[in-house]
Swiss-Prot record:
It is found in: Nucleus. The gene is lilli. The lineage of its organism: Eukaryota, Metazoa, Ecdysozoa, Arthropoda, Hexapoda. Belongs to the AF4 family. Residues 450-462, 1614-1625 have a biased composition (Pro residues). Has a role in transcriptional regulation. Acts in parallel with the Ras/MAPK and the PI3K/PKB pathways in the control of cell identity and cellular growth. Essential for regulation of the cytoskeleton and cell growth but not for cell proliferation or growth rate. Required specifically for the microtubule-based basal transport of lipid droplets. Plays a partially redundant function downstream of Raf in cell fate specification in the developing eye. Pair-rule protein that regulates embryonic cellularization, gastrulation and segmentation. It comes from Drosophila grimshawi (Hawaiian fruit fly). This is AF4/FMR2 family member lilli. GO terms for molecular function: DNA binding; transcription coregulator activity.
Amino acid sequence: MAQQQQQQHLQQQQQQHHQQQQLQQLQQQQQLPQYNNNLYNLNYNMEDPERRKRREREKYERQQGIQSDDRETSLFEAPRRLNPSEGDNMITAALGEFVDAKEHMCMNMVGIHRQAPGGGSNARLQGQATTPIINSLSSINSTTTTSSSASLLPGQLPTSQQQQQQQQQQQQHYQQQQRAPTYLKQADNKPPYNGRGGYPGQPMKNDIPSSSGMAPPRGPPRSASSSSSASNNNSSSATNNATAAAATSASTAPLLGPPMSTQMPNGREKSYLGPPAPALSNGGRFVPPAASGKRTSNTAGLQPPPPEKDISKIINEMTNSYRVTPLTSIAATPHAPTRENYNLNGPNKNKYAFDDVEPIGPLNSPPAASGASSSSLSCTTNSSSSLLMTPLLAPIAPITSPIAPLLTTPPQASQLPLPLPLLPPLAGATTVLPPALGMAAVAPIQQLMPTPPKASPTPPTAIRPLKSEKNHSLEKQDSCLENDLELSESDDDRKRDICSAGNSSNSSETDSSESGSEASSKGEAQQQQQQQQQLLHHQHQQQLLLQQQQQQQQQQRATATTANGGNKKKCQTIIASGANTISGLLTSSGLGGSGGAVNATSNTNSGLLGGGGGSGSTGGGGGSSSSGMGNMSSSSSSNKTPSPTDSNRWHLSRFFPKPTNQATAESVSPGNVACGNVSMKVPGILPGGAQIIPESIDVTTAIVKNEKLHDDTRRITDDEDEDEQQQQRYAAGLSVTVKKEQQEQQQQQQQQQQQQQQQQQQQQQQQQLSAEQLALAGALPNNQIKREVRLSDSASISSGSASGSSSSDSAAGEVVPLPGPGETLQIPGVPAAITTVLRVPPAMQQKVPPNSVTLTPIGPLPASPKPRQKKPRKKKMSAATAPPLDSSDEDEPASSNKKHALELAATTAAAAAAIAAAPAATAAALPAVKKGRGRPRKQQQQLQQTQSGNLSSASAGSLAKGPTLTAAKKPLAKSTAAAAAAAALAATALTVAGSRKREHSSNSSSNGNTPTKKLHAAPATVAAAAAAAAAATTLLPPTAAAGSSSDEDSTSSSCSSTKSSNSSSSGSDSEATATTAAAATTAAAAAAATTTTTQNPAKKRIVKINKLGVVSSSKNNRLYGAGSSSNSSSSETEEQQQQQQQHKQQQQLLLMQQQQQQQQQQQQKQQLQQHQQQQPLQPQQQQQQQSHFTPDAKQARQRSSSSDGSSSSSTDSSSTNSSSSSDEVDVHHGGGKRKSDKKKICTLTRIFNPKEGGAKKQGQVVIIDQSEEQLQQQQQQLQQQQQQQQQHQQQQQQQQQQEQQQSKEWKPRATPTQLLGATLASPARTTTPHLTSLMCKIDLSKLARVPPEWYQKSYRQYAAEQQQQQQQHLHTQQLHHPPHHQHQHYQQQHQPHQQKAQQNGHLSSRSAEGARTPKELQQAYGMPNGYVTSGGAAGAAGAASKLLGGVKHEHGVKPEPELDAGYEAKYKPNSVKQEFMPKQEMPTRRRKRSSSSSPYKEKKRKKEKADQVSKELLPVPVLLPANNHERLSRDKLELLQQEISSANGSPTKRSFPLAHAQQQQHQQQQQQQQHQPQHQQQLKATTTTSTTATVAAVQTSTTATQQPTTCSEAVQTTPPPVAPPPPPRLIYRSHFDNEEEPPSDDLRKNEILLQEAIRRKRAADSERDSFKQMTLYLEAIVYFLLTADAMERSNMEATWTMYKDTLTLIKFISSKNRPYQQSTNGKHESHNIVAILSLRCQSLISLKLYKLRRANCRAIIASCSEFFRTGGRGDILNGNTLSSISPSNSVGSQGSGSNTPPGRIVPQDIHNQLCRQNEYLTYVNSAHDLWDQADRLVRTGNHIDFIRKLDHENGPMTLHSTMHEVFRYVQAGLKTLRDSVSYPQSQ
């Protein structure tokens, strides 16, 4: 009844007011225009002029119909960030939309109404109007309806209110029609324009806010669910509802927005029409505009103020209707189908997507059960929004659930109490989500239809967080990188497309929309606090993770087992953890969670969901994501960077072949690298594929410090020491560190001490390991061990896990993240400065001990000594060796205790090995033996003496070390000799790994790198070595035993010159002491030594070197040396030769018995022992022959091997040891193959200091072992013939030589290197076939030819007094031993130099083509006085003159060893003089060679030698000038020669009269005494030569010897002073002389190259001077080319991109230079030359691009040819035939077809192929065209002389030039240009 009464009452009121309404309508119609004008004016005046203009412009556009409803627009056309600060977002989130609040305050509180009071056009106003306008149909009072509607949920509009809305709409329409024409939209039936705002159905500029006077609301348009937007005409999302009812009725209650699926990105709604539209009075032509609720008018006269409301009502309205409702992602996120309308490629590159992620509550709070306010992004959302949100989570959860397992909940997630099933996104991603951002998307909700998760077509991996923004810091901070590589936008667009396919919208965190959404989502301060807490919590977790990571790293480091994998993981957390550091962005989280933590820290700033989550995940795919999450997080991390799957992107990980165990972990998605807040300080990837190369990360010690941030985690305890050790070992083996040499030297000294300490500690630790444990350690995974070896000190670890080091060799194939230039580990996926290719062992850059030479064998070296023969030694080892093992390790002089402990382990292991083939244990012991790179030799010697017993370990160490020497070049060399020793000895199984290691370690032939042989040999060698050592120790007197052990030790040390050349010498010193002691008992000791040598495995090695040296030294040496050499060459030939030599030696012994009965006895014993051992055990024969311990043999070995082996002058014995060790290895290899003397190689390597050994300081030496057997046989024959003749003469000559040597040679003595340099430099250089400027080719077969006379002379020189005391006629044995022992240190200082000089000079004349002796070494070499004086003295005339002649002639003389007589004849003084003197070309050639150290000159020299290729055997160790500046003018050389000759004048003059007879006699006597076939051959030849010839040769040789000591001087001084310099002649070189430098895959090197390129480019960008700018640009180009060349070996696509971008850059540079090229005046000549170089570079780059695509081009040509051959298909006779193809268009097609010419239909694929072919062939065409342009410019600019000079010095640049040659050429040209510009007088 009450209702009926109310209805009646209402009806009465309606009737009563019906008339009033009509009157009011009329009044309103009259008042509206005025009201509108006033209101508009007010609003207009309230606005600032900027908005006024904008609105006017928009109004005009709307009136003109410029913007149509149907036009598809991105969510925001051009996001404008007025204040893109986080503070604005926070304010907006806190305050809500101020527009709505303002409107409410104006209407409800202040009472300002924007409509006439009777208008009732606004629901709010109507609800508040005193006299609401009520439709006849309406049954409810407006006030009650409004109040009730306020409480109603959206969408529940009461029917009365709907009726009222209809009535209002009709009235409004009527009123609008009554309005002034100015506001009437005229022809297009659009609702009248109310002054501002869009028409209800017309979307308006999204950014334009209501006239609130505030900045436009940031973020996406407010969705219909937001209450305030409903009343805003211009809010597209609200007004675009199909009916105005929804818009107007949203007044008091927020409308229920359309379902998420219908929300369109442009604000339009696709399917949801909202509440049904009321019938429109205007026929529905258009929705009447909602009364502009934004206009506030102060004109109270227009309408009565609304009745004042109760404050409680106002507050209720504010809280209910106008509460801050932050934008829900539902309203904001476009629906998945919107991809159709959402133009991802459109101008709006920063698209806005809003992720539906539940707000991150406090970590400890359980997730809200309902997805309502707690799960929704806004905690303040109304019940309506919560209702909306709850259903949304349902589809999201299953969709993201597949991601959850991928996320492998990071430790953060695991720590969260949140259950995964309830909140998979939280568990998987949001935990990592930087809470500050709070909006990271777990899954692209808008992309996913609400279909069940299984139905979702996209795989979970495709799901990517929506927030993938391009970091503006990347874009804007360094725009230079855009230019650095001339990145193409097409790549960016294409990659954005790829990303956009995954992400419906790429939202940038900093974008206004996202910030707005975030702000709204953050809503309350509570959320912000929670987020902050979460951030703190995340950071805390990350710190914990970092700590855990460090602990884990330490643990891993502690255990050598995880050497590879664990260390890699550790290292991969690059340089410093932190938000901005590389670790955050780049770490491919090796330890999933821990790495992720680092990433999370870095990403907290960027707020990438994937950043934390992915990083936490084990995969560690990128800075932001684990590999498992890979695509998802990576796309989230960057907007423009393509998904990591994009092929064109430079995936840094591509350049790192990933070890199998870390294939996934190391993958770093480039997107992640470029994520969020990445600054240019962090390496990353720019959109075009350019990499961000942080300049701050320089290759300096600072990096080492940075690395220690993480590495200290690994190396907390002894890491610092180990780091130094690593640096040392890298320096010794590979010189990995880029640190400057001075610093390195200082560090090395410190490091050596630290190493010794560390080694002691490690050894002590390792001692605990039993042989079994060592073997097990060897069984550890190769990659782990390998990694361990590299990261930690290779030596220390190898000693710790010797087998581990060996296994690391086997893992050499893997590319391990190597310590960066400053020890900084570089993550394989992300090099800090460069995309690098496979790591190539860096050439030794660190300072190597001055005496050490790193042999980088180029080409196959002669088979390394076979380790097999050590098996018999095993037996001996097991019995006798165990007790003495303690002392033998010479490697660690400092830590004898450690050695002993290790050796004890080694002894036990050795016994086990000998018994049970457990050489692994011995190997482990051996690696323990490893010593620091540089150790005082004396200490080592003392240790050796004390520890002489440990032959097995010493030999094993030597074996291992030998390979490391030769392998110095290899990365495994880092593991150092200890690793090699461990590899060889670790286990028979490990021996395979050891062989691998040796193979990797430079395929050092010395170690018998042939893995098969190694397999047999390594265990055999270990056991055999140990057994032989034991036997030797037992058999020999303690002195002899000590000497033998020291020999092996020294050999091992000498071989392992990479670790410590000094150590080798120290070993030799100890040996020397032992030998001196043995010298006392020359005969007995010799006999014992013979017996022991037969038994000593170490002596085998010596024998190998002795092949050459021993044979030359004496009969015994011959027996041993010949046998050993023959063994190396072939077992059969060895036996025969040995037998022959033994017979010869026996004959000689008979002759010698008259003079030396003691010697005869010793020799006979040695012979018998040798025969016995040689016949049954050829492999052991070398060991036996190593009996060089017999004074003669030992001395000879020491001479040959130590002169070769121990670059340090002091170590003869070390060289012998090296020879013995090599012999042992050879024995193991088997007699069938000759193998280069390991010790020789080692010694030679030491001789050539890498500092001076190569232009690149790589000090590479090629040692070639050539027909030693033939030479020996020939020598034997000659010896037999000459022995009888020369016996009598030798005595006299020896006496004379001794006198002369003592008196004369010491004074003038020039270092043998001088001789070598002078005589050998020119021919030898030219001969080096493969090596550019770095190599010295040494023919080991020729090393054997060092005349024993020379040794005798040297010994006589040094110990002439003793010789006289003992017997003047004592021959090689006594002469060698007693003086050798007594004066051994003295001899070591000089004899090795003599030997080296002879071997270097003599050998160099034969074998060493490119060997460079460092200046230090050259100076160090005491020129054996006997050598010089022998030339000068008549008594010494014969052999000495031959040596001199040979050595000097090595210069010009090109002996052919094949011709015995001819070979000798060439060494005849006459021939020498003729070749040397008359060949005036040679000095000029030398001059040209010396003119520049460039490899091209060496190539020229090679070409000159090409004529003399047959004479390749010239083993001249050419001393190449360190640089061009060291070249001496001819006058200076002559002066120097004259001075030296004047100093030596008397002896030389004396030598002339001594004449032929004395020379012959002396030679014969020496030959008889030494019975060395080589010298006999030479002596015979010399005897035949005339006295004048000898004198001339002596003169020339003396002059050569007198030449300056420095390498450059030696090289340059070679021309004889007499002959005038011949006119320079053109030197041509063959294209095949082009020897590419060995490609360096060293990561650090490539990084440095790229850094240098970018640094120069940036410098050029900022340079103002045009010439300097062009030169800098061009330098940058060549560095880019080197980088691309390095990349070419790993990733062709990246290489293509690099070359292409470089070509674009150089074209741009050339365009800048063109204005200067035009003028040919002298002012711009330099510009023309730069242009020439630039054009040539462009030509070569174009040609390179074609070559890279040559295979594709061939395929294209084949397919196209096939197509054209078959005639194709679809020939069109006339255009009308098209009608048949498309009959539907027959009418139009006929008309158009008549105009089309006849043609052929080409398939699309053929067309595409033709296009590509055109591109590729264009490169070829442009290459030749550009080259022709350069040539024309050379001619027209008169630059022919400049280019010709440049060509002569550096080799001509041709289209066949490699990038390294281009680099050298361009750099040389630019340097010349700069010099000419800076010092024009030089021109």
